Amino acid sequence: MLHLLGIISLAVAANAQCPDYIDYSNVPHGPFSGGQYNLSYMRPDPACRTFNSSIVEQTVDRVSQGIADPDLRRLFTNAYPNTLDTAIAWHGYANNSDEELTFIITGDINAMWLRDSANQMQSYLPLLTASQAFDSLASLYRGVINLQSRYILTDRYCNSFQPPVESGISPSPNPSASEDTVRPNYTNSSVFECKYELDSLAAFLEVSTNYYNATQDASFFKNYQWVDAVKSVLQVADEMMVPTYQPNGNVSELAYSFTRLTTRSTETTANDGLGNPFNNGTGLIRSFFRPSDDSTIFQGFIPANMMFASYLKSASDIMYAIGDQDDLAGQMCDLSESLRKAISNHGIVHTSNYGNIYAYEVDGYMSQNIMDDANIPSLLSAPFIGYLDRDDEVYQNTRSLILSADNPYFMRGPVINAIGGPHQGGSHANQMTDQATHVCRVGKAKVFRISISDLFTGPMASIIRIFTTDDEAEITQQLQQIVSSTDGLGLIHESINTFNVSDWTRQWFSWANGLFGQMILDLEDRKPEILGQSFQNNTS
């Protein structure tokens, strides 16, 4: 009966006369906020929402009452429930099983990214409690963990996936992936894109840890495929610590390679799909791509190694709690500790102006890439991902650098000042909104590729900046810039032209929207007086 109720509830939402949210979210709707920016109301009708949670609705109502500014209040109301409102494409069960599965799309792309889906669920972590009910947040979490386990065991190097066969949803074509040459091979029926990103595997450990810490439900992890998926993650870690060159000078045969026929360097890798040379003895795990889905310059990608070390250690607590897995848990702890040592030995660089800082990428050959990107994990997000404390000296030095003009991707302008990145590249795009090919919906339903000369920046970095400071003036400034830069739509965009508020990408980007709401809940706990401020008649 429980299975039937779940199927019925999903069928009702699917069969309702509901507009396509890509179109709906691109046009303002009343009632408007009535503030200086007069933000649109962007929540679908309750019958059209993809998942309804009473605890989330109660939280939206309660927190909204403590937000004095009408525009900030509307932005929170729209953004926080966005994943539940629009992105739970399917929630059900594996065939002939009580194994819960949850297929979460990114928003405007009908595919499930390991990283995005883990972070979309993290938005609701403050509300997560133990429950066996199918319509609970806990059930959504279990479904994500189970489906991610399946995905990793199917294609452990891939980053985004098609709907499970049980959903009845057809796979989505990915034209850009037709130009990919990837080892090991994969099929488009199960994989949307196969860019190996270490942070995607860290995200699986993250969502697992978040669920366990909130519910203490160790028994869940004994079932199904979670332990085997963790073993597969550790196999990737081992395979990706192999250097480019063997001791005798021969090139190592890596377990993974990737090339794409493209005009953009960030969409493929050097040296016939192996990437730039990576030295022996660093102790770091290689990553071919960043969380932006852009290729790394140097494969010792420090933020992903930080995230992996952090959540590998916390996930070992689950493995110990399961019982009969102490050896595996010990391996996880040991690898986490060795990664921390490797980051300290190879990821910290001395600079004359800032002292010791963390590099963004290294190769073990004394080459470093000094920058930061808006996407998480980033250097800015190191405290957010649990790697270190906010007052860590090297972090504070790094933070000073990456929030300055010495970071080549710190974008400045009259609209918003924040960290951006190279994810948006030049030339015109086709009409498909597709993260894999960097085709983006830009203001008023126009579709373009964005040139770096347009100085696009990511609001996600502004949100993380708030998470990682107690400076009330800094928090207030960042909130003001976020509230004033939605072009009246009242949703968090993927990126914004720092000189043109009406030039932006991806209004339906559920992760960023949920992250904004999560940040407001954090402020309610840490700095509630800020939520009582007005952001009217201010300038950014």
For the regions a language model picked out, list residue spans one by one:
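Fungal secretory targeting signals
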Residues: 1-17
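Low-complexity, Ser/Thr/Pro/Gly-enriched N-terminal "stalk/linker" regions
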Residues: 16-115, 155, 176-177
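Well-ordered alpha-helical scaffold segments within catalytic/enzyme domains
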Residues: 47-69, 119-134, 203-219, 306-325, ...
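Extended, well-ordered alpha-helical scaffold segments
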Residues: 75, 133-151, 217-240, 315-346, ...
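Active-site-adjacent bridging/hinge elements
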Residues: 84-100, 170-184, 278-290, 488-494
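Aromatic-rich carbohydrate-recognition surfaces in CAZymes
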Residues: 110-265, 512-524
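Extended ligand-binding clefts on enzyme/binding-domain cores
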Residues: 114, 153-164, 168-173, 224, ...
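CBM-like carbohydrate-recognition segments
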Residues: 158, 167, 423-431, 436-441, ...
